């Protein structure tokens, strides 16, 4: 197995480089015979032609020059087996794929690898390839628009006393941040399980979404802190009994952001939201840990949210027991999901809190599942309601 893995890695090291170097032999002709009507995926690295997408059929095409390989499979996430020509070029054609972003892996002779032709993305707890099956003009809200002002995404580290180590965040500031002394509300935004704080930028395009919405007058200017939902546990890093990531956010991160950026440092101008597990961490931080005095806006994007008629008065530390108090403290409870997500129980849970008298706004992304296109659409609906006076 070790020999197979080393061989696969050596072969993959040539992909995308072999034909680019002056004086090197050219790759077989099949590598430059592109399928009619296809275009390179927007997630491809510079000068890489594969994977390619047919916008009409939504099929994806992959080619690899791996003459010594015996089998090549691409998983998107279903498995598609490749065929090999006499020159050693493997071609893989998928079935029609749903629009939106998808992680994928390449398996060469049993060794699962990340395709070096695309940028690397963190998903399923692993580094994966990524492919974007494009929407039509309806997807322009999350695309880069050269005609609108653009904010910045800043990469920072901060020290967590709670965890005894540094932690990484990405911070979006709107285009106007550098031009004046204005102060801004802050959204703290979480990823889901198996992903990290890069996801909302690289896969979700939250910066492009806000650039476009702010320019169109559809969203308030805001700072967005994209943070990690995980804690580090090693012999050299402090594991404080009873402490969670919620304590890190409240005790370490919020003070750091208020000190570092021009924020409006009060609950009325502070929000928290997250997708999937990050939605559960949002309810845990704001409701279970009784931090409604620090956050007034909440967004759960396919977030863990299990509420029934029987437990509505006791769940989340009894946060819903007094609807009048809750509605006064939480300016927005926004719950969203994809229509094809399966039995997560979102409609029933929302109905239970609404029956209790809790103000709850819902949004359903039609035709999407537990995926980034759902969360892009959901974030857009959430953002247009956020920090409205």
Where are these regions (language model features)?
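Bacterial Sec-dependent N-terminal signal peptides
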Residues: 1-23
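Non-catalytic cap/lid and distal C-terminal segments of serine-dependent acyl enzymes
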Residues: 22-80, 84-389
């Amino acid at each position: 197995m070790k020999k197979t893995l080393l061989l696969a890695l050596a072969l993959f090291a040539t992909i995308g480089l072999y034909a680019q170097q002056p004086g090197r032999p050219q790759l077989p002709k099949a590598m430059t015979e592109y399928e009619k009507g296809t275009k390179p995926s927007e997630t491809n690295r510079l000068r890489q032609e594969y994977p390619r997408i047919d916008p009409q059929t939504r099929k994806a095409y992959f080619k690899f020059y791996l003459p010594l390989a015996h089998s090549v499979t691409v998983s998107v996430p279903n498995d598609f087996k490749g065929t090999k020509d006499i020159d050693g070029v493997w071609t893989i054609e998928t079935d029609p794929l749903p629009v939106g972003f998808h992680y994928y892996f390449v398996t060469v002779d049993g060794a699962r690898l990340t395709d070096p032709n695309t940028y690397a993305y963190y998903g399923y707890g692993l580094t994966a390839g990524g492919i974007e099956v494009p929407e039509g003009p309806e997807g322009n809200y999350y695309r880069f628009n050269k005609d609108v002002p653009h904010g910045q995404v800043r990469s920072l580290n901060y020290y967590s006393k709670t965890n005894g180590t540094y932690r990484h965040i990405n911070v979006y500031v709107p285009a106007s941040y550098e031009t004046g002394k204005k102060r801004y509300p802050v959204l703290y935004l979480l990823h889901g399980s198996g992903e990290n704080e890069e996801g909302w930028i690289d896969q979700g395009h939250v910066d492009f979404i806000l650039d476009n919405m702010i320019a169109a007058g559809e969203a308030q200017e805001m700072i967005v802190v994209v943070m990690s939902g995980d804690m580090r546990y090693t012999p050299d890093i402090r594991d404080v009994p009873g402490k969670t990531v919620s304590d890190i956010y409240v005790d370490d991160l919020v003070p750091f952001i208020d000190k570092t950026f021009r924020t409006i440092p009060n609950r009325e101008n502070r929000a928290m939201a997250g997708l999937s597990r990050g939605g559960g961490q949002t309810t845990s931080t704001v409701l279970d840990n009784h931090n409604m005095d620090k956050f007034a806006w909440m967004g759960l994007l396919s977030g863990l949210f299990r509420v029934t008629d029987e437990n509505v008065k006791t769940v989340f530390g009894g946060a819903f027991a007094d609807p009048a108090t809750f509605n006064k403290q939480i300016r927005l409870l926004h719950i969203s999901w994809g229509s094809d997500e399966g039995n997560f129980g979102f409609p029933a849970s929302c109905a239970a809190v609404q029956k209790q008298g809790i103000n709850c706004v819902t949004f359903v992304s039609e035709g999407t599942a537990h995926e980034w296109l759902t969360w892009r659409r959901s974030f857009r609906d959430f953002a247009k309601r956020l920090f409205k006076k």
